[in-house]
């Protein structure tokens, strides 16, 4: 999301209908954010991942990677010319990317919420990274952890949900479940406190991790924070 604070209405049928999205301004100018960026990787096309401002601001020659042909056509319709679908072994330089199972809600919500994807990044000299994306904790995530054995995991765990159908991504309790299923991995928890239908705060994740005894490997970046040493 690159739009200014409050430029979009709240997500309907959810909590905090008095709040407009995004809830905060960007921590630094868009120009700084895009400096040095040569690839955009999209898990899906919901407004809290890529908004109209992003379509307008990102240079049209930017290289995009998306989950499927439908998303490719949508992104191209905004004037972008270099849009590719992630396959079984898509490469960016020496980094290999492949899709991982993902489900954006329970049996009620997964259809209206639409398709989404996780991604796994591998490199001969780097740790395997699994970006779970917008998914609930379910059997597919367990399979991903067993299949790819990631050493670094990024989790969207803001507990975003709707009055009918419940949550569409993980929450703080699910962070503990992932940590138990991947006992040697570092976890980076994101997608927090940014939009109206978030229900989990950084402090909630921190307290849950502390009680579970996993705070030493659960990291909760602040807005604008860059993590380099994984």
Question: Model segments located where?
Answer:
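A short, flexible beta-alpha/helix-coil linker loop
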Residues: 103-105, 125-127, 159-162, 194
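Cap/insert and terminal regions of metallo-dependent hydrolase folds
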Residues: 136-223
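Metallo-beta-lactamase
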Residues: 66-126, 207-230
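Active-site HxH/HxHxD metal-binding segment of metal-dependent hydrolases
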Residues: 28-90
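Active-site neighborhood of phospho(di)ester-bond hydrolases with catalytic His/Asp-centered motifs
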Residues: 3, 36-46, 65-68, 129-135, ...
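Short gly/ser/thr-rich secondary-structure transition/capping motifs
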Residues: 19-27, 45-48, 79, 133-136, ...
């Amino acid at each position: 999301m690159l739009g200014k604070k409050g430029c979009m209405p709240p997500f309907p049928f959810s909590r905090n209908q008095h709040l407009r999205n995004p809830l905060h301004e960007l921590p630094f100018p868009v120009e700084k954010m895009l400096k040095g960026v040569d690839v955009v990787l999209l898990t899906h096309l919901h407004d809290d991942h890529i908004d109209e401002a992003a379509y307008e601001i990102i240079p049209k020659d930017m290289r995009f990677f998306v989950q499927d042909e439908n998303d490719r056509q949508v992104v191209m319709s905004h004037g972008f010319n270099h849009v590719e679908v992630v396959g079984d072994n898509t490469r960016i330089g020496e980094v290999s990317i492949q899709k991982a199972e993902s489900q954006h809600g329970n049996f009620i919500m997964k259809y209206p919420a639409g398709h989404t994807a996780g991604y796994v990044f591998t490199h001969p000299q780097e740790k395997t990274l699994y970006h779970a994306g917008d998914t609930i904790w379910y059997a597919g995530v367990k399979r991903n952890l067993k299949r790819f054995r990631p050493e670094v995991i990024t989790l969207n765990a803001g507990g975003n949900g709707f009055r009918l159908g419940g949550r569409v991504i993980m929450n703080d309790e699910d962070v503990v479940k992932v940590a138990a299923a991947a006992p040697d991995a570092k976890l980076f928890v994101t997608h927090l406190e940014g939009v109206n239908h978030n229900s989990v705060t950084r402090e909630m994740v921190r307290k849950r991790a502390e009680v579970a005894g996993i705070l030493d490997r659960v990291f909760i970046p602040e807005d604008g924070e860059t993590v380099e040493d994984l």
